[in-house]
Amino acid sequence: MEEFKRYLELDRSQQHDFVYPLIFQEYIYALAHDHGLNRSILLENTGYDNKSSLLIVKRLITQMYQRNHLIFCANDFNQNPFFGHNTNVYSQMVLEGFAVLVEIPFSLRLISSLKGKEIVKSHNLRSIHSIFPFLEDKFSHLNYVLDILIPHSIHLEVLVQTLRYWVKDVSSLHLLRFFLHEYRNWNSLITPKKSSFSFSKRNQRLVLFLYNSHVCEYESIFVFXRXQSSHLRSISSGTFLERIYFYGKIEHFVEVFTKDFKAILWLFKDPFMHYVRYQGKFLLASKGTSLLMNKWKYYLVNFWQCYFYMWSQPGRIHRNHLSNHSLDFLGYLSSVRLNPSIVRSQMLENSFLIGNAIKKYDPIVPIIPLMGSLSKAKFCNVLGHPISKPVWSDLSDSDIIDRFGRIYRNLSHYYSGSSKKMSLYRIKYILRLSCARTLARKHKSTVRAFLKRLGSGLLEEFFTEEEQVFSLTFPKASFTSRGLYRRRIWYLDIICINDLANH
């Protein structure tokens, strides 16, 4: 980072956060292309056609301001070289470079805040499965959870105002406004169910940065409350005095909110509040009562509407009791169930049976949604009956078997954390029979005749490596088939949810 800072010559302008002049520097676009300082890689790329030069960038900026961008029509929008499906090399360069520029103030502040601190680097925290051990440890002690969909109708000016606290460069903010107003369907980028993006895939870096910075703004209140309340377990006198001061600040903070909400919200005194977010959805769990969770729901709706001008319908926030409802989160149906156990106690000549119920976090495989995904991907019909995959009939037999087997192995790998993996047998049956029907269709034969001729060993790709994992992890233990499917394993190398539509 020091080399990066020196190369960008930010020392003279860092105090004002002036990043706009850097858009005329050619090496910015090399950074945007390969995330390094090697310009030769950029010039060797045929997609840029060896036209990356300072003169071209300056000429492009000049042409941008010579056009009148305040008047739009449908044809102009479709033909705009900056957006749409036009692969104009200059527009790609400017957008990629600007995405790097707006990240610079955040990166420099992060590096300066970490000086003198020893940071433990762990790539395992990038895994989606790293969330579930946390839920397993915490949720079994909690009562209620708010299942919340983050509002996605963000006003364009709100995004710009969010960056004003970090980037004081007015010219950069004007350029950001230009990009955002050119793209009039901005909200579809962050709507989970919409996939028709007008931005090029190369420019999603800017989109994700703006969205995450915006979410970080209203997410900070949870981080603040949790970071302060997490020290309550400490018993030192200094920490005790710090807690008194902290609660004094909270009471003052709540009194300030009284002016807007006409009620005192004693929400931030709950030391058992836990927060988890992934993409456009987050969970807020607490050991408190139903009344407390209703107050949180009321607070969030008003907070988004009053301070971020985002309309959030109360129906997007669901309050559930963990013992009675299942949460659809990260592809699992999670719940907290009571696990009864009976202990026999012997005292002299008398014996007693003591019943005890322990709360246990239980993630299960959502078999019905999975079958719906298989039906959408044309592996089975809506009733779950396997069908052939005609679009793969032109592939070789080994490629067909490998594709079907890879889909099942990925699903089995992702749902290894469930204690009820026996339900995956239905998915395995659908994929195996769909594979057999695809091969039979290719060879113009029936499934029975095809398998009889080649043998059942043809579909060995569908046998997972779970047994090998257990034998390596527990070499001295022996597991039955039933015990194998009840054991939970959380893998720390999964960085995305398996999408059946993109196999």
UniProtKB/Swiss-Prot annotation:
Tell me the protein's name.
Maturase K
**Subcellular location, record wording:** Plastid, Chloroplast
GO BP: any one term: mRNA processing
Concerning HAMAP family, the annotation shows: MatK
What role does it play? Usually encoded in the trnK tRNA gene intron. Probably assists in splicing its own and other chloroplast group II introns.
State the Gene Ontology terms under molecular function. RNA binding
* Keyword Ubl conjugation assigned: no
One CC-aspect GO term: chloroplast
* Family from the record: Belongs to the intron maturase 2 family. MatK subfamily.
Q: What is its main location?
A: plastid
What highest taxon heads this organism's lineage?
Eukaryota
Presence of keyword tRNA processing = yes
Q: Which InterPro entries match?
A: Domain_X (IPR024937), Maturase_MatK (IPR002866), Maturase_MatK_N (IPR024942)
Note the PANTHER family from the entry: MATURASE K (PTHR34811:SF1)
Keywords (A to Z) from UniProt: Chloroplast, mRNA processing, Plastid, RNA-binding, tRNA processing
Pfam families named among the record's database cross-references: Intron_maturas2, MatK_N
